[in-house]
Amino acid sequence: MKKLKINYLFIGILTLLLAAALWPSIPWFGKTENHIAAIQARGVLRVSTIDSPLTYSVINGKKYGLDYELAQQFANYLGVKLKVTVRQNISQLFDDLDNGNADLLAAGLVYDSARVKNYQPGPMYYSVSQQLVYRVGQYRPRSLATVNENQLTIAPGHVVVNDLQRLKETKFPDLSWKVDDKKGSTTLLEEVISGKLDYTIADSVAISLFQRVHPELAVALDVTDEQPVTWFSRLDDDNTLSAALLDFFNSINEDGSLARIEEKYLGHGDDFDYVDTRSFLRAVDNVLPELEPLFKKYAKEIDWRLLAAISYQESHWDPLATSPTGVRGLMMLTKNTAQSLGLTDRTDAEQSISGGARYLEDMMAKVPETVPEDERIWFALAAYNMGYAHMLDARSLTVKTKGNPDSWTDVKQRLPLLSQKPYYSKLTYGYARGHEAYAYVENIRKYQISLVGYLQEKEKQEAEAMKLAQDYPAV
């Protein structure tokens, strides 16, 4: 997966151009016969989406997702409530628009020339490529030339069908596929993993997140180049909704909240390590159950799964782990840190976890209040790894190089510079292994994503097994 970046310049320019073109007809807060006025009169913004880790999901009763958070902010911007409808596949999403059951589709949908003939696109805020996937250990196709409908299944409404048709007409005449009208992309990915299907096609971001939980899913080849992702509304609407969307995206670009959401959901790095992810998930099954009660006990305000991910990064959940520099235990605490926390045995699992949690809380408390709440943890983790003083240097360097010291996206880009003499020689606290702190935080984020997704999958499987047992007729 290529590094994803929101096209801020495009959003800004497009906002100005469309606003100039549309403004005479759309003082949308003043008219009553337009879409925005209708939404505000109704008091509800209706958004249809797909259940996926990136777009929208519910974990322990809390809603997550890049598209969900953006949609919630847009609803707040309009001064209305948000109503989310979850559909199984893309075809059902566009049915909602056609039938007047949705104002917007916010589901990681790709901008496509065929779609824009019938639907109104919004701002394009990140990009993906479409990739053909297979299961590790099975035959990997190197080209679409020999792929046929007995091997490749696509979800209904998937935009890649248009790309496949063009490729069939221009390069691969024997290429064929089938569309399963009853299954969405997530289900098809699961069937590739289970061996029920040979291949399917999904977007690169969805695949990247899926691999954190299912490392046996592998990319065979790119089917398309990078394609922009956007929201869609009805084409026959007036322009008030489009203008409001453009103004909204421009405003969250300017205040930095768009970049923060991008960092939260797309900033976990592109590098997927099959062996490391598989080893981690094995440890989740075999080692974590014994330690889980302790992580839950001492996490307090921190997500216990994040605390567990930190511990795995530190020690691979080995209570006796020792580094060449003398740090020890599950949380790899120094002797001085352990003593300051009142710990007597760093190799005792409970003492180490409780001490590590308290030390992280101390780092969190030191992070300046100007740092947004949902990014404070990343600053704290970098400080946990390399020391708070060096985090101050990283923030100072970010200011000197015209970045935002309260933005984790900006600060993390400067961390590797802390080990380069032209930079650290001019900083208050000198040399630091900033590149290690950068990798440290990125790895923890990946482990947390894997752990959250994997545990959610297990809960789903257990619930389905329980239901099956309850429904099974007694004999």
Swiss-Prot record:
Subcellular location, principal: membrane
Segments for region (Non-LT domain): 31-269
Name of the molecule in the record: Membrane-bound lytic murein transglycosylase F
HAMAP family: MltF
SUPFAM superfamilies: Lysozyme-like, Periplasmic binding protein-like II
Topology versus the membrane: Peripheral membrane protein
Gene Ontology BP terms: cell wall macromolecule catabolic process; cell wall organization; peptidoglycan catabolic process
Enzyme Commission number(s) from the entry: 4.2.2.n1
Catalytic residue list: 314
Family affiliation: In the N-terminal section; belongs to the bacterial solute-binding protein 3 family. In the C-terminal section; belongs to the transglycosylase Slt family.
Highest rank taxon of the organism: Bacteria
UniProt KW keywords: Cell outer membrane, Cell wall biogenesis/degradation, Lyase, Membrane, Signal
Signal sequence bounds: 1-30
Pfam families: SBP_bac_3, SLT
Gene name linked to the record: mltF
Any one annotated GO CC term: cell outer membrane
Catalytic reactions of this protein: Exolytic cleavage of the (1->4)-beta-glycosidic linkage between N-acetylmuramic acid (MurNAc) and N-acetylglucosamine (GlcNAc) residues in peptidoglycan, from either the reducing or the non-reducing ends of the peptidoglycan chains, with concomitant formation of a 1,6-anhydrobond in the MurNAc residue
GO molecular function: peptidoglycan lytic transglycosylase activity
Domain notes: The N-terminal domain does not have lytic activity and probably modulates enzymatic activity. The C-terminal domain is the catalytic active domain.
Function: Murein-degrading enzyme that degrades murein glycan strands and insoluble, high-molecular weight murein sacculi, with the concomitant formation of a 1,6-anhydromuramoyl product. Lytic transglycosylases (LTs) play an integral role in the metabolism of the peptidoglycan (PG) sacculus. Their lytic action creates space within the PG sacculus to allow for its expansion as well as for the insertion of various structures such as secretion systems and flagella.
Compartmental location: Cell outer membrane
Region (LT domain) residue spans: 270-475
